[in-house]
Amino acid sequence: MLNILDAKMKTLTNGNKHTTLKLLSNNNLNRFIVKTFSIDDVKSWKPSPDPYLMVTNHYKVKPENTLMIACHSWDLEGAKNVGLQTGYIKSYEGGLSHSRSIPDYEGDNILELAENILSIQEDQIIAT
């Protein structure tokens, strides 16, 4: 499913960049990721604005044209606070635990989330 989307995915981690790259490689996900960002680059932990804005600034895109997918509600809230669109994978926390932000998209797992994103975007394309 991920290769069908032909999405240019990036990761943004509170963890060590090297550890994240190894984790992606060990799970054969590195082929879908074009760049990995770490909070080490901005010396500020998510959900503060700096890590999210580092990514949008790097690619010179507006936050509202960027989609952050996460399984932690606090991460989605940080992304929403800087204007990013958000997608929530519910299977990790089981639901939005303490977030005041409602995600733009959600799914029980990554495949369901991707299907929901594609379905909504198809509806928007047809409606315009």
Where are these regions (language model features)?
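Conserved phosphate-coupling serine/threonine residues in phosphotransfer and NTP-handling enzymes
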Residues: 13
